[in-house]
């Protein structure tokens, strides 16, 4: 409740976590953008879910940072969960472009996505990954108010104390 005090938002997150854990090969047709203050514990809140779906080594998780979003290589597309870490486009003009680049990954159709691997021919993979984005920026991406591809929540929780972070 510290990170997501709104009951409806929290219930939606529990539903997402339960569904993807029970149905890892089924697409959740929207992404979650969890924003909040750095060090507040957003990624810690999601850690048990990631472990449940991806295993103790998180082998079926694609971790994507800002630089990788612009890469032609699509290794993360093979994952069950794609994590967009520190989602942020500093320029307003590029925020809309980022949202457009993410559309086919977040929702299906398309049913298939093309994976480019260095030294190999491109191939198609089923578009079933769940996209989870984190940001410390209050405006990390520009999306229209009626876009159903994103479930966005902002945690007002303060930075965790050092003792809390060690638990």
What are these regions (language model features)?
Residues 1-3, 154-167:
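A short, charged helix-loop
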Residues 1-87, 98, 151-154:
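P-loop NTPase catalytic core of nucleic-acid-dependent motor ATPases
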Residues 54, 97-123:
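Conserved catalytic/switch belt of AAA+ P-loop NTPases
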Residues 71-77, 115-134:
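AAA+/SF3 P-loop NTPase mechanochemical coupling elements
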Residues 78-80, 127-130, 145-151:
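Short glycine-/polar-rich loops that comprise or flank the Walker A/P-loop
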Residues 80-107, 140-147:
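Conserved AAA+/SF3 P-loop NTPase catalytic/coupling segment centered on the Walker-B
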Residues 103-110, 131, 139, 157:
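Signature of the SF2 helicase/ATPase Hel1-core->accessory helical subdomain module
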Residues 142-160:
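A short helix-turn-beta junction within AAA+ P-loop NTPase domains corresponding to the substrate/partner-engaging
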